Amino acid sequence: YSDVNVIAIHHALVKSGITPQEVDVVVTLPLSEYFDTNAQPDMANINRKKANVMRPVEYQNGEAFTIRNVRVMPESIPAGFKALADMSPFESLLIVDLGGTTLDVAKVQGQLAGISQVFCDPHVGVSL
C-alpha cells in the first residue's frame, strides 16, 4: 500500500519495453492480508490495494502507463494455476511460498474449485 509499490510497478512496465498505454495488472497480497479471520477475502484490504496501485504516476521525461484495471490475488496461489487446471476438483495442491518477509501455505482444490486451508506466518521470510 506504499508509494514504493506503485513506483515499482510502473518501473517494471517501463523496463518491459512496451509502449506506455492503458494496462490491466494482477498483483498479490500475503495470505494474512488477503483473507480475514474467517478465511474469506478481506475486501477492505483488497480494495485498498487496488486503490493504491491505480494511483497515477507522472514521469519527467515521457509518457506514463495508465492502470485501467487491477486484479488482486492471494500470494502463492497464482504459482499453482497450471497444475490446478490439470487436476480434478477432488484433488488438491499444497502451495508453499517462502517469500522475503512471509511464509504462505495454501491447500487449493483442483480446477481452483476452492481454497480449503491457508496459513501465513508474517515473521518468517528470507530477507535479512
Report residues per predicted region.
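A short acidic Gly-Thr/Ser loop motif
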Residues: 95-103, 108-110, 124-126
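Nucleotide/phosphate-binding catalytic cleft detector across ATP-hydrolyzing
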Residues: 1-95, 112-124
